[in-house]
Design a protein with these regions (language model features):
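Secretory pathway targeting signatures of secreted, lumenal, and periplasmic proteins
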Residues: 2-61, 83-89
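Surface-exposed amphipathic alpha-helical segments
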Residues: 19, 107-146
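Intrinsically disordered, low-complexity serine/threonine-rich segments
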Residues: 11, 50-51, 66-68, 132
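Hydrophobic residues on conserved beta-strands that form the core of alpha/beta folds
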Residues: 8, 16, 70-72, 133
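Compositionally biased, intrinsically disordered low-complexity segments
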Residues: 18, 34-37, 46, 54, ...
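Signature of long, low-cysteine stretches enriched in small and polar/charged residues
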Residues: 55-108, 141-145
Length: 146
């Protein structure tokens, strides 16, 4: 199976009310931050970010992973345990879309979360940033459905 890394010009990222979207372009890479100041998390994409795998935790004593399987995508989270004395953690994720001809389209990213605050704000058992990741669309497929 062929794996392809999605670029920013191929996706549409919705912004939830009260969130901030910051795009930064420079000569080498492009960044996209979705900051949720009231929910205490930031979703972060970097155009040069590698596709993450379970090996992202090599050298860590404990880690966990979570997969959300949806009709049009699979979201794989790799969540290290919190460092003693810190309330924030960096989570890694891949969103995997099924492309044409059996290829897998990957969109990797990171989420900086204040664990205590985020866990208190789950809605129906769902972490607040999952809604953003569920609504990301591939532009090519958006054009075909319109």
């Amino acid at each position: 199976m062929v794996a392809k890394r999605l670029q920013f010009d191929e996706i549409e990222v919705p912004i939830v009310k009260g969130h901030e979207k910051v795009i930064d372009k420079d000569a080498t890479t492009e960044y996209l931050f979705i900051n949720a100041p009231r929910d205490i998390y930031t979703v972060y994409f970097d155009s040069s970010m590698p596709i993450f795998g379970k090996n992202v935790f090599d050298g860590c004593e404990e880690s966990s992973s979570l997969e959300l399987n949806m009709q049009d995508r699979k979201i794989c989270f790799y969540c290290p345990t919190r460092t003693k004395g810190r309330k924030d953690a960096l989570w890694y994720f891949n969103i995997v879309f099924a492309g044409e001809n059996g290829e897998s389209l990957f969109l990797p990213g990171q989420i900086l979360v204040n664990s205590d605050e985020v866990y208190r704000k789950t809605v129906g058992g769902k972490l607040p940033f999952v809604e953003i990741l569920e609504k990301i669309k591939i532009k090519k497929y958006m054009d075909e459905t319109v």
